[in-house]
């Protein structure tokens, strides 16, 4: 009989990280495009604020399970402005990172043997948590443009379906789901009285300046929508683990049970930093967004050198480019070979699909947020000489 953790696979970032253990990259420097996280610390003004905040007694004590009221209120205020409707403070909860927000959502929505629909390729940590929770993942294959089809999703709904989970902008594909597609999924979920979990971790790097969707403008949206967010990317607070969950007050009452049992309260320093960032770093964040968009454009402009070799750019946006390689070699073997031959570390598409799905063997993810436009050109020049 397997334990809960034995029901799932090894974390992909850790697994591919072992490929570089003991390797010498002094002659050919490693290009690491495996992990979607800022490697730089928070901006200096935020670090200085945190240095002062750590002197406050409250920073070191337990706080409310659902997070600091001031941070919940600020999210409600800014989200209401961004999405064009009123979100209440009581509809906002703070979690220890966005992965915990997803875990809490599943604990609140699902029981043993229930089902959640995930578009494939999926964000692997979502699949891992569903495995460990005893919840079945129902794969929803995406189209060639990496957009999930609501009509196909409808055919997958059963009496055990409890939620559809979307990530937009997407991880691993980078694709921004059009508002009409998001709305179609909302209507589908509402019709079947299931939840629509929408993870918007990369919302701050969306290419459009307007509302990415209008879910929050729907009557009684909180009976269907479970919105997830991360402060890790926006303010480089990866190590401080601060996320958010927005849904109905009733559902947050159930989420509170999970959070109180697992972590008691979110990190106080991280919450204070997130609040200060929201109130003081809007212009800085705009600059971060523009830089990510410049790198996205560098991916698009520079990909021709790979297209000529048979590669295909399947999706690009936020922190990611998702590509198809031209070789017969499976992507998990190819990616390990890229480390040895070309000093490139990336994650193969096989790690974004259920076991037995052959689709990922031709695909891989490039997390480009941590490399410059110059390094993007270097990456492509190396990939252009890749071989089996």
Please report, for each region that a protein language model flagged, where it lies by residue.
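N-terminal small-domain helix-loop-helix segment of the aminotransferase-like
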Residues: 6-97, 104, 278-280, 387-388
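Helix C-cap/helix->beta junction micro-motif
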Residues: 26, 133, 191-192, 342
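Conserved core of the PLP fold type I
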Residues: 59-187, 204-208, 212-219, 374, ...
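Walker B catalytic acidic pair
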Residues: 200
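Conserved core segment of the aminotransferase class I/II
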Residues: 221-290, 300
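Conserved glycine-rich beta-strand-loop-beta hairpin in the small C-terminal domain of fold type I
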Residues: 275, 292-300, 312-325, 362
């Amino acid at each position: 009989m397997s334990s809960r953790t034995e029901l799932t696979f090894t974390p992909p970032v850790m697994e591919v990280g072992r490929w570089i253990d003991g390797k010498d990259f002094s002659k050919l420097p490693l290009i690491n495009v495996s992990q979607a996280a800022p490697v730089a610390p928070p901006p200096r003004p935020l670090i200085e604020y945190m240095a002062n905040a750590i002197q406050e007694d409250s920073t070191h004590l337990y706080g409310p399970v659902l997070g600091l009221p001031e941070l919940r209120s600020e999210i409600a205020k800014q989200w209401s402005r961004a999405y064009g409707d009123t979100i209440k403070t009581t509809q906002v909860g703070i979690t220890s990172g966005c992965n915990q927000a997803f875990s809490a959502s599943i604990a609140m929505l699902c029981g043993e043997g229930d089902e959640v629909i995930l578009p494939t390729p999926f964000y692997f940590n979502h699949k891992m948590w569903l495995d460990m929770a005893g919840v079945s993942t129902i794969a929803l294959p995406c189209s060639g443009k990496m957009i999930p089809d609501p009509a196909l999703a409808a055919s997958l709904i059963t009496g055990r379906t409890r939620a559809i989970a979307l990530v937009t902008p997407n991880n691993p594909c980078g694709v921004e789901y059009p508002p009409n597609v998001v709305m179609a999924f909302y209507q589908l979920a509402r019709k079947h009285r299931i939840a629509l979990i929408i993870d918007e971790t990369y919302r701050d790097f969306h290419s459009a300046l307007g509302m990415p969707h209008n879910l929050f403008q729907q009557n009684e949206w909180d009976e269907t929508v479970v919105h997830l967010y991360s402060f890790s990317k926006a303010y480089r607070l990866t190590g401080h683990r601060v996320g958010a969950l927005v849904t109905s007050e009733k559902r947050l009452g159930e989420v509170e049970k999970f959070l109180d049992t697992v972590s008691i309260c979110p990190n106080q320093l991280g919450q204070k930093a997130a609040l200060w960032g929201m109130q003081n770093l809007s212009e800085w964040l705009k600059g971060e967004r523009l830089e990510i968009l410049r790198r996205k454009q560098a991916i698009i402009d520079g990909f021709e050198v790979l297209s000529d070799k048979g590669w295909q750019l399947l999706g690009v946006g936020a922190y990611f480019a998702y590509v198809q390689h031209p070789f017969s070699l499976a992507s998990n073997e190819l990616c390990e070979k890229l480390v040895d031959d070309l000093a490139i570390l990336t994650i193969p598409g096989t790690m974004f699909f259920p076991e037995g799905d052959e689709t990922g063997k031709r695909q891989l993810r490039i997390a480009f947020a941590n490399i410059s436009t110059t390094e993007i050109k270097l990456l492509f020049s190396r990939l252009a000489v890749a071989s089996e």
